[in-house]
Amino acid sequence: YPLRRQRQMCIRDSGLIGQFGVGFYSAFMVAEKVDVITRKAGEKNAWRWSSDGLGEYTVEKASKEDRGSSITLYLKKDAKEFLEDLRLRTIVKAYSDHISIPIVLVKDKEEESLNEASAIWTRQKKDITQDQYTEFYRHVSSGYDEPWMTSHWRAEGRFDYSALLFVPSKRPFDLFHPDRKHRVKLYVKKVFITDDCEGLVPEYLRFVKGIIDCEDLPLNVSRELLQKNQMLTSISTAVTKRVLNELKKKAEKKPEEYVEFWENFGAVLKEGLYGIPNEHKNSLLELVRFKSSTRDGLVSLKDYLAGMKDGQENIYYITGESQEAIKNSPHLEGFAAKGIEVLLLSDPIDDFWISSMFEGYEDKKFSSVTKGSAELENIEDAKDKGAKDKKGEKKSKKTDVSLLIASIKLTLGESVKDVKESIRLTDSACCLVADEGDMDMNLERILRQHQQVADAAPRVLEINPTHPLIKGLVKKVKDGETDPILEDAALLLFDQAKIMAVSYTHLTLPTKRIV
């Protein structure tokens, strides 16, 4: 038993080996001379070590009543600030607040403890109250709100680390600022190293706050070594996986509370779906929530798949500047008529991440209702089945618009890529759609605002053969009339389509067609 106890004490104290030198060398950054007086337990004599840090030192006998060591710094003229109480308190609070050794400031023979001398993340979760977690969250985040989620764990294996992370209940005002960084602090053996460790957590988790304490990194690790450290890369991967899993559990067990989180941080989380290959994409997709054309509240992709119609092969979505603009889009008419759910995306990041999702989700591709052919004819609902005649053929109420299409093409020329009969329109006379393979119109709008593209690309104009206006124009064309109103009508339809598309910032001489 004595040997086992001695071995445990040696293991515990082995972490102290080499700790002194790191801080000691830094003393010469602010001191022109350093004296160390030390007396070993059991010996009468003490020794003074003195150096100016320029490569030479002296050792001589000294007097010291008690055992131990004392270090005296003779500060440089430009380092007198380190004699100020406030400066000392700030430094200790920032870097050594949680080390096990208490740090005491003595002033006028009165002692004041400057650090907590304990680290909450080293304790068992069962020994920590929610109030204590909240207090530490407010300390580490400089906030006053309650943590929406707390995640505390210790990992042991190829490398050991502890993590205590929080998701705020309120969104920071600078969450979308270009210079915004994550707020996770890196500690090594309870000593603060940096709160600006690139790659410690991914940018799309920059709302997460807390600490990660690594046991296996050296205290004097540099910023360059941190950026290239394989251990930190592995820790980052593990931490990201853990946080996403915790969010998934929260979403499944408390969906109402998850809605609150999504409204605060959903747009940031979706950033992880765009850009470089991400091994966590599937986990992120399971966390994404959408507004829908057929339901109130938010829906997940699993909810969407469960409600797909017979014959539906794609996950349909539409992007736009705002939810109000999207809901009034004519592109939704045909889908609404068949009861097909369309996901409504209005965050600026949506156009970027969803256009890069070539692999889709659960073998279903993402398809924009503003691009290509709608393929609605392959999806049937109860109304479609009731509209079939005895031979199984659908009754046709469409008007032959081929002559009108030719007339409109002649008028619009290269202003449009093509003119087609629409199967996605039920109420509106016309709309613009992007051809398959072309850039989505809302994405083009965003890029034009940032001067990333020049003029708007020509689009496909679709006309609704069941609309009274189109029927009237078809009659005029069939009657062989050369009425100038046909040309004006074509230009008016095109302008109306551009207004509804909200992707064109100007109209060509609109005053000529204002009545």
What are these regions (language model features)?
Residues 100, 114-123, 160-256, 260, ...:
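GHKL/Bergerat-fold ATPase module
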Residues 1-7, 11, 506, 511-515:
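Single conserved hydrophobic/aromatic residue that forms the stacking wall/gate
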Residues 31-34, 67-69, 188, 313, ...:
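Short glycine-/polar-rich loops that comprise or flank the Walker A/P-loop
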Residues 38, 51, 73-77, 166-169, ...:
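Flexible glycine-/small-residue-rich
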Residues 258-293, 297:
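Active-site cores of enzymes that catalyze phosphoryl transfer or operate on phosphate-rich substrates
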Residues 275, 279, 283-287, 300-507, ...:
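C-terminal interaction appendages of subunits in large macromolecular complexes
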Residues 86, 106-210, 292-309, 313-314, ...:
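GHKL/Histidine-kinase-like ATPase module
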Residues 12-113:
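GHKL-type ATPase core
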